[in-house]
UniProtKB/Swiss-Prot annotation:
This is Signal peptide, CUB and EGF-like domain-containing protein 1. Glycans are attached at residues 370, 466, 679, 750, 779, 789. Induction: Down-regulated by inflammatory cytokines. The lineage of its organism: Eukaryota, Metazoa, Chordata, Craniata, Vertebrata. It comes from the Eukaryota. Keywords: Calcium, Cell membrane, Disulfide bond, EGF-like domain, Glycoprotein, Membrane, Repeat, Secreted, Signal. The gene is SCUBE1. GO terms for molecular function: calcium ion binding; identical protein binding. It comes from Homo sapiens. One of its GO terms (cellular component) is external side of plasma membrane. Detected in endothelial cells. Highly expressed in platelets. Stored in platelet alpha granules, and transferred to the cell surface upon activation and aggregation. A smaller form, probably produced by limited proteolysis, after being released from the storage granules, is associated with thrombus and localized with the subendothelial matrices in atherosclerotic plaques.
């Protein structure tokens, strides 16, 4: 790779970091090392240290000695007269070391090198009778007026005014006065002083108190001249040596500046200088207005750091906390995600139940008292259906079985769908009229399914309404004939599958003519799919193409039977009529002149792509515009196409689904019920729980003693079983049955043995006194029997997505607790010339298990292969590291002990040319010194962006400079910038 290419790639590089338990290297297997040092077989010098090595040993001279280890000699630190071992007075060499001493009148400073003046006057006034005056390196005694100092230089003698002897106050000697034989006086000086030419004054020399110099002294004609040791400066007094910033930073904690009077200390932002003028004390910014932090303020040395409560993240201003919208992440919830301040909640679609915190599994309703079915129960995805044995068919309530030939007098005759056509201006338009039982299911923006009517009794299962039957049963007018079925596929060019109200005014139409004269249309399904198809020619734009798949079910009109045309004849005639109708429909659909009429509104099945619609027109069928969003009409309402708004269901109808175009007639024909009924139980007139009747409607009678019924509108009651009775009639639950023992949660009552039985593995029971256990949702199971809650149900599947550039591994049932005795193995094999970077945002493995649950990453399955990472503990701080091998074999195992949340570990593969840079970043402790940096490795959006750029550096240009600043803290960007700049330096 050329220098320019490397620079270009690295200038756009963003990277991550590491902390954690990483495996170290190991020696060669099979070799036994001999420790010569401990056995004393080495030949190191007595002043050397023996250090064992894998194959031999080596000798190192001790500190203070020089040589190659087998011969060592003392280093004379004092031999350099200029530096003098750093001693300002005298340097004394000792074997392997040295020490500093000071002249009389001085003492050694704490640094062991400098010499400070001793104030002798502090100790018994220096022995002076009257006045003691301290001086650098010495002191002198003085007397009060009228006295003079005696020869011992400590006591004072009263002066006389007579004569010229030494007792006279005017004898003129500076130090010592001696009387001469002739009666005169002679002056003398104390040791270390020379008598001046006037024979009275005394001149100081370097021999007394080091000449008054703190460090070095040199005698000159004018007296001692002072000097200072290296790195010290002479004070303006000409005697004292002051520290400079070159010596121990001038004694300053932080910043040192040399001045004429000595060093001046200062402190950086976040510290304040203490009264000693040298020490810096940290300022606790959190004491004032919480440091400006929204949530938490944590004081640090010289600064502070803001933190946020769980569920919030710190913005790049490093003060403000913002709620984390977990619902914006991929794979947060299986079905529905609802964000809330600091948290989120996962919900499941109807017929599913939540497990493992975020996952949705199908509820096996049949495991709960047989789904309340009278006979058989068949579980389906998101629902279930009751089935009946031969000779019986399902009641309108979808639970009870009634005789096939038995009519329900209160049930309405199923309204018929109708296919018809009309002409306007020579153009033929066709219509599908759905008077009732319309189901609209939008699969996607450009796909939907519309069904109209009710399948025949011998056809496939009843029309499903979000997993439940339509609630219709046989009526006295329903024909038991086998329906005629036909499937056709139509193609519409330049059209999209948008089911929208048809508002365009059409010319006056001729009367609509039915397409099927000799039959009844009982059920029609229309499935519309749109896709783009590229035209011939590279520059030709792609065109929208829609396909409509129609399935028809028709029944013959038995009332038209005659001697000349019996049942077979009528059926053949109906089939011919259906074929002709399909031909007519094909022409109509091809011209985009096909409409569906529901609840008085005509809808275009597919239309030409138009300009972007605004307002209500931008929403699909079954949706209305609220707060600039398209929202589906809720249960209890239907979409009124002409009004463009949601309309409540009329009394006598109900709607238990969202986004529908009509309401379903109630099974009762009395028109009772609530307006806006959300399910069939709100239709009115049904028997209440604990009661039943032949058709499920009033008048009703109470369930006899020994039976119960928990649901409304039923035709019978369930027996308690095992000869158990109830205290009274009209009971609604098995809990009303007088069982001989009261079972606790995790158990069910066996009516044969009259004992409580623990729920088997794979089931649970959260309530008291039940006669069944609930099967775990989906493909989950429990770790043990007797489970009391759905949270004990765990998915056994090992999660993850392994890609060449990015991917992740996930413990089973994450983020719920993983199951017992789980074993997962993943293999990461990156493309050539790429290396692996792994981030563990957090990992939860119970340490109480004595490492029974382990995650290990190695080169291969062999226990002796190179290990990159291994842990059996919980770490809530992020961990990141590069793989020690090009490929990774990863294993997770759990035992039967405690369980934990587990882990979700993302990884990225990067160009091996960046290996040095990545290693430099991930091994820098500053990456983890800040909680803000740690949160980056936990933020799924930021990790995704970082991995995107690491895997594909050119993708950096997707993120603007402003976006990068808004995504990452300044300190993080600064850290990366310095690393990248240093790495690029050789290429400049």
């Amino acid at each position: 790779m050329g220098a320019a290419a490397v620079r270009w790639h690295l200038c756009v590089l963003l990277a991550l970091g590491t902390r954690g338990r990483l495996a170290g290297g190991s020696g060669l297997p099979g070799s036994v090392d001999v420790d010569e040092c401990s056995e004393g077989t080495d030949d190191c010098h007595i002043d050397a240290i023996c250090q064992n090595t894998p194959k031999s040993y080596k000798c190192l001279c001790k500190p203070g000695y020089k040589g190659e280890g087998k011969q060592c000699e003392d280093i004379d630190e004092c031999e350099n007269d200029y530096y003098n071992g750093g001693c300002v007075h005298e340097c004394i060499n000792i074997p392997g070391n040295y020490r500093c001493t000071c002249f009389d009148g001085f003492m050694l400073a704490h640094d062991g090198h400098n010499c400070l003046d001793v104030d002798e006057c502090q100790d018994n006034n220096g022995g002076c009778q009257q006045i003691c005056v301290n001086a650098m390196g010495s002191y002198e005694c003085q007397c009060h007026s009228g006295f003079f100092l005696s020869d011992n230089q400590h006591t004072c003698i009263h002066r006389s005014n007579e004569g010229m002897n030494c007792m006279n106050k005017d004898h003129g000697c500076a130090h010592i006065c001696r009387e001469t034989p002739k009666g005169g006086v002679a002056c003398d000086c104390r040791p270390g002083f020379d008598l001046a030419q006037n024979q009275k004054d005394c001149t100081l020399t370097c021999n007394y108190g080091n000449g008054g110099c703190q460090h070095s002294c040199e005698d000159t004609d004018t007296g001692p001249t002072c000097g200072c040791h290296q790195k010290y400066a002479l004070h303006s007094d000409g005697r004292t040596c002051i520290e400079t910033c070159a010596v121990n930073n001038g004694g300053c904690d932080r910043t040192c500046k040399d001045t004429a009077t000595g060093v001046r200390c200062s402190c950086p932002v976040g510290f304040t200088l203490q009264p000693d003028g040298k020490t810096c004390k940290d300022i606790n910014e959190c004491l004032v207005n919480n440091g400006g932090c929204d949530h938490f303020c944590r004081n640090t040395v010289g600064s502070f750091e803001c933190g946020c409560r769980k569920g919030y993240k710190l913005l790049t201003d490093e003060r403000t906390c913002q709620d984390i919208d977990e619902c914006s992440f991929e794979r947060t919830c299986d079905h529905i995600c609802i964000n809330s301040p600091g948290s989120f909640q996962c919900l499941c679609h109807r017929g599913y139940i939540l497990y493992g915190t975020t996952h949705c599994g199908d509820v096996d309703e049949c495991s709960m008292s047989n789904g309340s079915c009278d006979q058989g129960c068949v579980n389906t995805k998101g629902s279930y259906e009751c089935v009946c044995p031969p000779g019986r068919r399902l009641h309108w309530n979808g639970k009870d079985c009634v005789e096939t030939g038995k009519c329900l007098s209160r049930a309405k005759t199923s309204p018929r769908a109708q296919l018809s056509c009309s002409k306007a201006g020579g153009v033929e338009s066709c219509f599908l009229s759905c008077p009732a039982h319309t189901l609209f299911v939008p699969d996607s923006e450009n796909s939907y399914v519309l069904s109209c009517g009710v399948p025949g009794p011998q056809g496939k299962a009843l029309q499903k309404r979000n997993g439940t039957s339509s609630g219709l049963g046989p009526s006295c007018s329903d024909a038991p004939t086998t329906p005629i079925k036909q499937k056709a596929r139509f193609k519409i060019r330049d059209a999209k599958c948008h089911l929208r109200p048809h508002s365009q005014a059409r010319a006056k139409e001729t009367a609509r003519q039915p397409l099927l004269d000799h039959c009844h249309v009982t059920f029609v399904t229309l499935k519309c799919d749109s896709s783009k198809k590229r035209r011939r020619g590279r520059k030709s734009p792609s065109k929208e193409v829609s396909h409509i798949t129609a399935e028809f079910e028709i029944e013959t009109k038995m009332e038209e039977a005659s001697d000349t045309c019996e049942a077979d004849c009528l059926r053949k005639r109906a089939e011919q009529s259906l074929q002709a109708a399909i031909k007519t429909l094909r022409k109509s659909i091809g011209r985009q002149q096909f409409y569906v009429q529901v609840s008085g509104t005509e809808y275009e099945v597919a239309q030409r792509p138009a300009k972007a619609l605004e307002g209500q027109g931008a929403c699909g069928a079954g949706q209305v515009l609220q707060d600039s969003k398209c929202v589906a009409c809720g249960p209890g309402t239907h979409f009124g196409g002409e009004l463009g708004q949601c309309v409540s269901c009329m009394p006598g109808t109900y709607q238990d689904m969202e986004g529908q175009l009509s309401c379903t007639p109630c099974p009762s024909s009395d028109g009772l019920g609530l307006p806006g009924a959300r399910n069939v139980s709100e239709c009115g007139g049904q028997c209440s729980p604990g009661f039943f009747s032949a058709d499920g409607f009033k008048p009703c009678q109470a369930c006899p003693v020994g039976t119960y019924q928990p649901e409304p509108g039923r035709t019978g009651c369930f027996p308690c079983g095992g000869g158990l009775l109830t205290k009274h009639e009209g009971t609604t639950s098995f809990q009303d049955c007088e069982a001989k023992v009261h079972c606790s949660p995790g158990h069910h009552y066996n009516t044969t043995t009259h004992r409580c039985i623990r729920c088997p593995v794979g089931t649970y029971q959260p309530e008291f006194g039940q006669n069944h256990c609930i099967t775990c949702p989906g493909n989950t199971s429990t770790d043990f029997d007797g489970s009391t809650n759905v949270t004990h149900c765990k998915n056994q599947h090992c999660g993850g997505e392994l890609g060449d550039y990015t991917g992740y591994i996930e413990s089973p049932n994450y983020p719920g607790d993983y199951p017992a005795n789980a074993e997962c193995v993943w293999h990461i094999a990156p493309p050539p010339k790429r290396r692996i970077l792994i981030v563990v945002p957090e990992i939860f493995l119970p340490i109480e298990d004595e490492c029974g649950d382990v995650l290990v990453m190695r080169k291969s399955a062999s226990p002796t292969s190179i290990t990159t990472y291994e842990t059996c503990q919980t770490y809530e701080r992020p961990i990141a590291f590069t793989s020690r091998s090009r490929k990774l074999w990863i294993q997770f195992k759990s035992n039967e002990g405690n369980s934990g949340k587990g882990f979700q570990v993302p990884y990225v593969t990067y160009d091996e040319d960046y290996q040095q840079l990545i290693e430099d970043i991930v091994r820098d402790g500053r990456l983890y010194a800040s909680e803000n940096h740690q949160e980056i490795l936990k933020d799924k959006k930021l990790i995704k962006a970082l991995f995107d750029v690491l895997a594909h550096p050119q993708n950096y240009f997707k993120y603007t400079a402003q976006e990068s600043k808004e995504m990452f803290p300044r300190s993080f960007i600064k850290l990366l910038r310095s690393k990248v700049s240093r790495f690029l330096r050789p290429y400049k």
